[in-house]
Amino acid sequence: MGNLNIATDNDCINIVPVHFTYVTATTSKGNANATFGVLKDIIDGKVGTVMTNGADKAGKVRIDSAIGLNEFYSDRNGTEELVSVKRNEGGFVHITNTLAPDEKTHNTFTADMLITSVTQIDGDEEKGTKDKAIVRGCIFDFRKAILPVEFSVTNGRGMDYFLGLGASTKEPVFTKVWGRQISQTTMDKTIEESAWGETLVRETPRTRRDWVITGSNPEPYVWDEEGSITAAELTEAMADRETYLASIKKRQDEYKASKAAAAAVPPAATQEKGTFVF
């Protein structure tokens, strides 16, 4: 289990992690797993990395990953809440010699999304944020399991389009969306003038992680129809998700109970040297 961090731009600022839970050396048919081989070569240093070898000597890879969720329950102010964090989950990893010249194609995502709400968020000049729309709903993995997600829209025309869809929990909109993953840390510089001598320079790191929609189908899919997705199928998928969340909660409760039990065991008494008390 671990992450493969990919720099998607030449300046190595936008770093997109890809999570691998478990990768086997062979496929189900008994053949060598090419992805396992590539990952092992990276770990063993046979393929260069930016951190170890520098950007010029780092290996180039192409990854066909899938959107997944890292989900767990967290205690916040005495209340247990579900935390769902989007991430790139697994996929096929290929070594390549060349990359597409347009960096905008290096960190893309595509998904069929059932949209249930769109909210406008005003930007904050002091924090360096701009106006955007938050598109909420769900996507589906290869097992057709529900993955609740939200994406951003920063383009003005795009914001107007999604806000105008009128999507709601009673009247969802099913469509294809695509966009780019932003995962970068930049330094904000503040300069204070001095009455004399050197100025005071402060640098503050600012991290931005977002999944930004840059386009969508001209026409949404037909909702609640055979060949698309029906309300009955969605209801069944929602029931399956509740079962899945219950299993996460159970595992977490069992883990907490085992830790509490271990902490409650008194330490073994230390026998004094030269005495034998049975």
Task: Name each model-derived stretch.
Residues 1, 7-13, 103-131:
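Structural detector for short beta-strands of small beta-barrel domains
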Residues 54, 59-104, 180-243:
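OB-fold/S1-family single-stranded nucleic acid-binding modules
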